[in-house]
């Protein structure tokens, strides 16, 4: 059985993330969607909220499990016996950022990184952009799953 990990901050999960998850789930026997802590990013949702949203939007995917992790993603992969890391690429900047990490991960443990290009309709979507546009009153309902949109609106309304 081939197990892969699709890591991210998912703050919040977008339809672009979900597209990558669905496509990766069709490729691998088992996919673990893992949300971790990235100290360089400020968070709107805490880890448990992000896990809840991911579980809700991935509920229809029988071979997908949602888990949290701390530390290095390659250590998490080793702990759960995952053979690959799946990362979505929106464009060249993502590749420039992800390539050295993929090379380091392979150096540390031999875990391979599989890059999936984002569908053109989601290429401009990022969690950061969704949060910024939503905080300024813009309509992001087409960019996030409905359950996530409700939570996002409630969180921003609460201040």
Swiss-Prot record:
InterPro entries: Cyt_trans-like, PPAT, Rossmann-like_a/b/a_fold. It catalyses: (R)-4'-phosphopantetheine + ATP + H(+) = 3'-dephospho-CoA + diphosphate. It is found in: Cytoplasm. Its cofactor is Mg(2+). Pathway: Cofactor biosynthesis; coenzyme A biosynthesis; CoA from (R)-pantothenate: step 4/5. Substrate binds at residues 9, 41, 73, 87. ATP binds at residues 9-10, 17, 88-90, 98, 122-128. GO terms for cellular component: cytoplasm. Keywords: ATP-binding, Coenzyme A biosynthesis, Cytoplasm, Magnesium, Nucleotide-binding, Nucleotidyltransferase, Transferase. The keyword Cell membrane does not apply. Reversibly transfers an adenylyl group from ATP to 4'-phosphopantetheine, yielding dephospho-CoA (dPCoA) and pyrophosphate. Belongs to the bacterial CoaD family. This is Phosphopantetheine adenylyltransferase. It comes from Nocardioides sp. (strain ATCC BAA-499 / JS614).
């Amino acid at each position: 059985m081939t197990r892969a990990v699709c890591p991210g901050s998912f703050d919040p999960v977008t339809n672009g993330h979900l597209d990558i998850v669905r496509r990766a789930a069709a490729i691998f026997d088992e996919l673990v969607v893992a949300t971790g802590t990235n100290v360089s990013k400020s968070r709107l949702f805490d880890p448990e909220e992000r896990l809840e949203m991911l579980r809700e939007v991935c509920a229809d995917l029988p071979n997908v499990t949602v888990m949290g992790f701390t530390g290095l993603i390659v250590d998490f992969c080793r702990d759960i016996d995952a053979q690959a890391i799946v990362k979505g690429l929106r464009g060249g900047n993502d590749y420039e950022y992800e390539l050295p990490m993929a090379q380091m991960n392979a150096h540390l443990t031999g875990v391979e990184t599989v890059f999936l290009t984002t569908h053109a309709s989601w290429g401009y979507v990022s969690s950061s952009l969704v949060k910024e546009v939503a905080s300024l009153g813009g309509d992001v309902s087409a960019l996030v799953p409905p359950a996530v949109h409700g939570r996002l609106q409630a969180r921003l309304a609460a201040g």
